[in-house]
Amino acid sequence: MSGATGRDLDRDDAADGWFPESVAADYDAPGGANDPAVVEPMVDVLAELAGDGALLELAVGTGRIAAPLAARGLDVSGIELSKAMVARITDKPGGDRVAVTIGNMTSTRVPGEFSLVFLVFNTISNVTTQDGQVAVFVNAAAHLRPGGRFLIEVGLPSLRSLPPGQDTVPFTVAPDPAGGGYVGFDQYDVVTQQFTSNHVTVTADGSGRFRRIPFRYAWPAELDLMARIAGLRLKHRWSDWDRSALTAESTKHVSIWEKPFSG
């Protein structure tokens, strides 16, 4: 089981926020969100939505999605706060063709107009205030050409899984056959819509690492209101990248809002 080393922790830069070197070191580990079976359907949909226009990924990270899009010959730009994450984009095919700007996705602007702005893998929730999330929508809309679209992929909070009177839901329990393992759990504050995602990794020798990342969840209806504030209107909402319908059993949604051709 891999994990950040003490040297990685020593290199962490506070300017990288919640995704410094110690996180970036493991971010591209095989499997999970990096599995080609997960990535390729996403890239297919995004490429189709972009058509002949340019794409902008907010919170581009290590280029998990942006690099494969660029490898297909698409014009891809990205905004990312963490230099440690961005340093890994060029390790991927197509990564050297992604134009990255270091900055905050709530306010950083890049040149040009885009047919698609997108924000995937729950990253809207990394913005932990309602005003900040609204600012993301406003910034996305400012980058869109008329008729352009803003796409978000985000999980639905597992509030129905909370035991009565409790605030914690485990999402992964993964023992390692070699010893140790990994446990992940979310802790919710249903009053403020804040939650923390907690990650505990234990190695075979008994040493471990704990990481906590704060989030703010927003229901689809709240995101639609944010979109309206930004001048966007809902175009599609799916349960997953296969475009299946959103149901009461869905654990996430992929939502797309469109910028009108005129006011």
What are these regions (language model features)?
Residues V134-P146:
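A short glycine-rich, Lys/Arg-flanked "PGG" loop and its adjoining helix->strand segment in the class I
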Residues R109-L116:
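A short acidic, Gly/Pro-enriched loop at the edge of an enzyme's catalytic core
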Residues M1-G61:
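Conserved class I S-adenosyl-L-methionine
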Residues L151-R228:
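SAM-dependent methyltransferase
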Residues A218-G263:
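C-terminal lobe and adjacent flexible extensions of AdoMet/dcAdoMet transferase-like proteins
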